[in-house]
């Protein structure tokens, strides 16, 4: 609250295993931030929707509890990005948020939860088309777009090498770089990482490539977060 950022961006995994009661309680905490003047933007992570592992724990006893559907997720977190969205994708929980006159935030839902919850992620075809339309519009107006997804755009971990990178990441990178997108924010790994996309080995470090910044899940100890400051070159 004291830092007063332009927005708090949460790239998914808002709960342990998609428990409805946890979503509801977490949304209550986020309302405190919005009441203090900090806009909050959320998208789901692979833990958050249609999760059959949703559980309550009483001592050593585990009881399965209700998770949430995509529609319920959007209803619970409606005031944290969705209600203020300038545009929404036709086939996912992705949306575009206008941060200010020069910056848009594109919240991309990369999760697979229909008909069941899966760990890996993909950007649906309709969302890819919508994504490029938004980027094209922003580019023509000189506006910077910061895309955010739960799953990763690149292979950033030698430990977690499966089900982390967006299935159609190559296509997504081509679209992002077509419009000189500066950075992609992601989660999923629950660590802090940063990497620049290189088109081919040995490429000069001065050649443009989209950067990716991975941030930890805010709800999981040690509850790490990152601060992104945007400055115009020159």
Question: For the regions a protein language model found, what residue spans apply to each?
Answer:
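N-terminal active-site segment of His-dependent metallophosphoesterases
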Residues: 1-20
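His/acidic metal-ligating clusters that form di-metal
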Residues: 4, 39, 98, 104-107, ...
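Active-site metal-binding loops of divalent metal-dependent hydrolases
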Residues: 12-14, 46-48, 110-111, 150-152, ...
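Short catalytic/ligand-binding loop motif for oxyanion handling, primarily in non-cytosolic enzymes
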Residues: 16-19, 49-53, 114-116, 154-157, ...
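Acidic-and-aromatic substrate-binding clefts and catalytic sites of carbohydrate-active enzymes
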Residues: 16-21, 85-87, 162-163, 218-221
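Extended active-site neighborhood of metal-dependent phosphoesterases/phosphodiesterases
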Residues: 25-129, 206-207, 227
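Binuclear metal-dependent phosphoesterase catalytic core
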Residues: 99, 204-234
């Amino acid at each position: 609250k004291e830092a007063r950022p332009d927005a708090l961006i949460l790239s998914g995994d808002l709960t342990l295993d998609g428990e409805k009661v946890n979503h509801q309680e977490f949304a209550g905490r986020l309302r405190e931030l919005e009441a203090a003047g900090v806009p909050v933007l959320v998208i789901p992570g692979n833990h958050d929707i249609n999760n059959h592992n949703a559980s309550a724990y009483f001592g050593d006893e585990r009881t399965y509890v209700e998770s949430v559907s995509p529609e319920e997720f959007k209803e619970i977190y409606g005031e944290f990005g969705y209600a203020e969205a300038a545009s929404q994708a036709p086939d996912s929980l992705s949306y575009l948020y206008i941060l200010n006159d020069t910056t848009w935030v594109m919240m991309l839902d990369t999760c697979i939860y229909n008909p069941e919850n899966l760990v890996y992620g993909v950007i649906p075809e309709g969302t890819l088309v919508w994504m490029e339309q938004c980027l094209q519009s922003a580019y023509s107006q000189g506006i910077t777009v910061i895309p955010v997804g739960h799953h990763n755009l690149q292979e950033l971990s030698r430990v977690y090498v499966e089900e982390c990178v967006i299935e159609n990441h190559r296509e997504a990178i081509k679209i992002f770089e077509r419009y000189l997108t500066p950075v992609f924010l992601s989660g999923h790994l629950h660590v802090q990482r940063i990497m620049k996309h290189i088109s081919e080995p040995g490429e000069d470090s001065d050649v443009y490539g989209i950067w990716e910044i991975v941030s930890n899940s805010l709800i999981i100890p040690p509850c790490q977060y990152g601060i992104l400051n945007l400055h115009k070159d020159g």
